[in-house]
Amino acid sequence: MGLIDCKAIREEILNDVKSQLAELKGTPRLCIVTIGNDDASKVYVRNKIKTAKELGIDVQHLQLDDDICQEEAEQVIEAICNRSTNHAVMLQLPIPSHLNKDRLLNVIPQHKDVDGLTDLNMGMLVNNRQDAIVPATAQGVYEILRRMNRNDDLSWVNVTVVNRSQLIGKPLQALLTNHNATVTLCHSKSDYDFDGADVVVTGIGHAHSYYSEDFFDGQTIIDCSMNRNEDGHLCGDVNYKDVLTHIRDIDITPVPSGVGILTTACLMLNVVKCYLLQGGE
């Protein structure tokens, strides 16, 4: 019990990606589309490009102006997706508020939707289709749980998820249910506590909203948020140091170097999956 070593899990995932890439005759390509100049997005894109290149995955990054209109943005994304050499396509979020995010995402074909955010991929995930592409953060949470359980079957676990977003809560509920977990999905309007949960997953996006008094012995806490505290330091929803100080029998992810580093690794898994779904060898 204690701090979950997400760095070790990340290395295991990346080694899996390397093994899959070594068996391929061709080279998968990831195409990242960015609209505007969001500072956080620049950091995330840089990390994705760095990780992909280290693995030997081709990467193309296309930066679009923040004043681009909806129609032109859709046309650009469609043109990128129509190129057979682009196997995995992602729209880096957030995008400027005048654009319709859902329309842009759904331009991407299911088999190239490396982020797993199209309506079709979400429906396939809910229906437990093996060719569904799972959003990377949700997959990262699952990778933690299946390694801790040493089994893909999660029928032993009751999970409380505090997030209902398209990126985390909704796909995670479907993914964990597909692996036989019992999942309770909460949000800002819910009246909830964590009593009875074996696993708590948080993603509310508020620095240090949870402390040791919110949790119980024997639980696993997975913090999916990346916030900044009053001093400008990166932190999660949970004050993990306070939790570890007051509860001995508990597992918890750190922030930083927690779920965030698994997200990029799982995205690389999805790049290979996209390539294979298109008949790549």
Feature map (PLM): residue ranges:
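Positively charged, low-complexity intrinsically disordered leader regions
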Residues: 1-26
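Short beta-strand segments enriched in small/hydrophobic residues
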Residues: 27-37
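Short beta-strand segments
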Residues: 34, 90-94, 162, 203
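Short beta->alpha junction loops
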Residues: 36, 60-70, 188-189
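Glycine-rich phosphate/diphosphate-binding loop of Rossmann-like nucleotide-binding domains
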Residues: 41-49, 132-224, 229, 233-250
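Short, well-structured alpha-helical segments in soluble
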Residues: 72-84
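Anion-binding alpha/beta catalytic cores of soluble intermediary-metabolism enzymes, centered on
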Residues: 90-154, 208
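Rossmann-fold NAD(P)-binding glycine/threonine-rich loop
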Residues: 104-123, 223-278
